[in-house]
A protein has these predicted regions:
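Short beta-strand/loop motif that positions the catalytic acidic residue
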Residues: 236, 242-244, 248
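Short alpha-helix in the alpha/beta-hydrolase fold that links the catalytic acid
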Residues: 252-261
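Short glycine-rich catalytic loops that host catalytic nucleophiles or stabilize transition states
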Residues: 270-276
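Gly/Ala-rich beta-loop-alpha elbow adjacent to hydrolase catalytic centers
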Residues: 177-181, 185
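An N-terminal hydrophobic leader/cap segment in hydrolases
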Residues: 49-89
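Catalytic histidine-centered segment of alpha/beta-hydrolase-like enzymes
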Residues: 276-285
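Membrane-embedded segments
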Residues: 97-165
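Active-site nucleophile loop of the alpha/beta-hydrolase fold
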Residues: 199-208
Length: 297
């Protein structure tokens, strides 16, 4: 049986050997076009990947442009809302509320809070620390029952309206702004005759802060509300106190320093509250002491 298979195997092997060059040649001819095909497929894959990355980037930039104010403003309700502690500003397009502590006399204090602050919570402490002042704490649009939506321009208009209304009965007005509100305060002080200006955890511009947080985004083209405090600081002529937190995790010290340098010479002074953060600065005794040194003279 095995001997009968030998001639058959020999014939098969011989046939295969004779056809091997043809098959090799065939393989060679078939394989030559495969390199351009693979290269073309790779190019298309890379191009698709680049297009996808660009599309995602543009989508993110578009989302940031349209939803940026939801990343800046975080409206809070008012905790202190009794009728005798609130003033209504009737603006052209909405109504804006102000938490107040009325006091007769020439002195008044207007306060602008942070981007997620319920300013009414400051009333008890402000009333105790500054007993001779009538107090006016502005609720930004969308905050504390105020109508409308917040924006830099709208808040600036509300601040001017509040100042003009308060000035009718209080000729000596001090302005205090904290965090985001420091930008509101310095802009107002450049346009109205304030008595003193205090800026708590202030910044040179919101654009600078946003550019550091989103270095991959063309912030200078997308940002709507820039809060360019440094630009307005150059026009301030009244005594100004800047209070920085020693361990501020939101506002970099160099931003506050650049703001200080934009004030005219001998107008502003910077003090650093020790062992304090961006949100805890008002828990330190120096915060109240240094503000009192300015306001309670």
């Amino acid at each position: 049986m095995w001997l009968m298979l030998v001639p058959l195997l020999r014939g098969s092997v011989a046939c295969c050997v004779r056809r091997l060059p043809e098959r090799i040649a065939g393989l060679h001819c078939d394989s030559e076009p495969s390199h351009p095909v693979k290269s073309s497929r790779m190019s298309r894959t890379l191009m698709s990947l680049v297009v996808l990355i660009v599309a995602v980037y543009l989508l993110l930039c578009t989302a940031l442009f349209f939803f940026q104010r939801s990343l800046i403003y975080f409206p809070q309700p008012a905790a202190v809302a009794s009728a005798d502690s609130r003033l209504k500003l009737s603006m052209a397009d909405t109504e804006v509320w102000v938490s107040t502590r009325e006091r007769s006399g020439p002195r008044a204090l207007i306060y602008f809070g942070g981007n997620a602050e319920d300013v009414s919570r400051n009333l008890p402490e402000f009333a105790e620390a500054f007993p001779d002042y009538a107090l006016y704490l502005l609720h930004y649009r969308g905050f504390g029952g105020s109508g409308g939506s917040p924006s830099e321009q709208a808040i600036a208009e509300d601040a001017l309206a509040l100042f003009d209304q308060v000035a009718v009965s209080h000729p000596q007005i001090a302005v205090v702004g904290r965090s985001l509100g420091s930008g509101v305060a310095v802009r107002l002080a450049s346009q109205r005759p304030v008595q003193q200006l205090i800026l708590v955890t202030p910044y040179n511009s919101l654009e600078e802060i946003a550019a550091k947080q989103y270095p991959w985004v063309p912030v200078q083209w997308l940002l709507k509300d820039r809060f360019e405090s440094g630009k307005y600081a150059a026009h301030i002529r009244v005594p100004t106190l800047l209070l920085a937190a020693s361990d501020d995790e939101v506002i970099a010290r160099d931003s506050t320093q650049r703001l200080l340098e934009n004030f005219p010479k001998d107008v502003a002074v910077l003090k650093v509250v020790p062992e304090s953060g961006h949100n805890s600065i008002s828990d330190r005794p120096q915060y109240w002491q240094w503000m009192g040194d300015v306001l309670n003279r």
